[in-house]
Amino acid sequence: MIPEEITIREFNRNDAKDIVKLHSESSENFEEEEITEDFILNIANRNDFRLFVITLRGKVIGFIGVLFHINVGRAEIGPICIRSIYRGRGIGTRLLYHAMEFLRQRGIRRVIVRIKSENTRALMFFKKNGFIEEGYFREYTRRGEDVIQLRRFIWECCV
């Protein structure tokens, strides 16, 4: 059940500290072991990247990033993170669909996500939301972890 006080909006620089904290709470799911506020501010300033936050009563409880290439109609989802106590309530799905709608409005037709193979919760989340496996990359990360690539075509999205 999604609380009514939920809001999704574009990232602003005041959110950087909250994103760093959220990342540190789930760092085992990310390729980067540690990130800084400067790192977040740098990627958020890219023209081909958008970061959205989801808030509950004004407090950041999750975020999603999208890297998009309008000229070729492709995008990549990631990172995505929801504070652990709010998982399983549809909040991540709402955030994902917000990002997918953003991409659809920009003419993106193909979206991928890459997930560490042992992150079964994320794999189930994306499969539940219509993504299908299309590739397996052995020792893909700096630490030698395997990664699974999933994809979804944007017109399949019920945004």
Model-predicted segments: where are they?
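Conserved GNAT acetyl-CoA-binding A-motif
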Residues: 104-114
